[in-house]
From Swiss-Prot:
Gene name per UniProt: SKIP3
PANTHER family: F-BOX DOMAIN-CONTAINING PROTEIN, F-BOX PROTEIN PP2-B10-RELATED
Database matches in CDD domains: F-box_AtSKIP3-like
Protein name, per record: F-box protein SKIP3
Record-linked SUPFAM superfamilies: F-box domain
Lineage per the UniProt record: Eukaryota, Viridiplantae, Streptophyta, Embryophyta, Tracheophyta
Biological process (GO), any one: protein ubiquitination
Residue span(s) of domain F-box: 21-67
Keywords, ordered alphabetically: Ubl conjugation pathway
Pathway: Protein modification; protein ubiquitination
UniProt key word Glycoprotein: no
Subunit (UniProt): Part of a SCF (SKP1-cullin-F-box) protein ligase complex. Interacts with SKP1A/ASK1.
Amino acid sequence: MIRLRTLIEKNRSESRKKIVSSTLDSLPEGCISNIISFTSPEDACVAAAVSKIFESAVKSDIVWEKFLPTDYESLITPSRVFSSKKELYFSLCNDPLLIEDGKMSLWLEKASGKRCIMLSATAMNLSSMADMSQRFLWIPCPESRFETVAALREAYRFEFNCRMNTRVLSLRTRYSVYIVFKKADNWCGFKGVSIEAVVGIVGEESFRSFICFDTHGKGQARKRKVVAKPELREDGWMETEIGEFYNEGGLMSSDEVEISTVEGKYAQQKRGLVILGIEIRPAKILEEFSVCRL
């Protein structure tokens, strides 16, 4: 009896889908494109699988121009030509652009179109810190999108403080902040060490947490706070989440996000930390989708 009821409900659901699909298919293709443009890139790719007319409508520049940043024309070089706005969109997702004189890189999150940013180690102002000015070696790295990365020679405390204007980010979006790094052959001094990290919009309440760079470190920190442990990325680097913040403003915003670390008084000698930079991306990363084969 239960099985029969389940089959009936399944048939009803499939019938509703066919009715909706049939109704929408009767609309002009341009109208369908306009409707889809108010969704998201992920939803558009799902819609393309509904029917042939939907697949054709999703290819329209009307759809993908809505998903592009409003200032996208200033982000691409005039000499580069794209066959469609969809091709341009996925180029901005897959090929990070260097901005701010090569101190930052920008790309779009594929599923949502939200902006992502990486601050290079240079933009972290490591060399401006009094105790850190001579403690980093700036070296070229073929694996990096930036000209140089920062390799820690020797220091008792790993501390930095940097700021970035939020206008380069997507408005009304919650972001997660990560420090991206590798371990050099002379890596030492980080085992069991937890470092306090602070992230927040200047003038507003900040997000405080504890991080560690050692994958074998303890799971708990002072005051019973959980320590964020590093994870291996697809590009071979490691990352540790520093914190989160909410970006309300957009291109005209004058807000700044401040990111810093503070180590306790019981510091120990450290070396061998290679820093690529600080990555800022939407806090709720949507799952990768692969149906976009248009």
